[in-house]
Amino acid sequence: MSKLPHLTIRRAGPPDAAAVRSLTRDAYAQWIPVIGREPLPMKADYEKAVREHEIDLLYSDDKLVALIEVFLTADHLFIENIAVSPEHQGKGLGHQLLKHAETKARNAGLGELRLLTNQAFATNVRLYQSVGFRIDRTEPHFGGGTTVHMSKQIAGGES
């Protein structure tokens, strides 16, 4: 795992929607041959998402390299999307963004993180499990395949 130059994180706003879409499409393109279609994050409305969710952008110097999209509920923080540019995958940025999500949840008084992923995204499932997420249940996905519901209890929250 090579070290990246200086990393900074900032909240996305409406002017960032195109960059969010571009990074997400690049990050998820690897899964098209695996599932035979574009994954749902590649089709999302990011103009709407930057208004309704918290999307934090991770930069290496001045280059956008990763992002995390979350929203708060009454009892947990839901991770809608994590995307890391293909050339920066495997460098620990996903782990860093998951820790960032834990901090957000704690700051909001929440003790649980939740997310969904496609069972075919085996490397992602393993990543989430490696940082303490557990599989709560699986269910058939309306577009084919299997959706994996995962959660992680965190210390310092109320849930």
What do these predicted regions represent?
Residues 7, 11-87, 95-104, 135-143, ...:
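Acetyl-CoA-dependent GNAT
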Residues 128, 133:
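Conserved active-site tyrosine of GNAT-family acetyltransferases
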Residues 2, 146-159:
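Terminal substrate-recognition subdomain of acyl/acetyltransferases
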Residues 85-91, 119-120:
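Active-site acidic-Proline motif in GNAT/NAT acetyltransferases
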Residues 110-111, 134, 159:
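Intrinsically disordered, low-complexity, positively biased terminal segments
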Residues 105-117:
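Conserved GNAT acetyl-CoA-binding A-motif
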Residues 115-124, 141-146:
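Conserved beta-strand-loop-alpha-helix junction that forms the acyl-donor binding cleft
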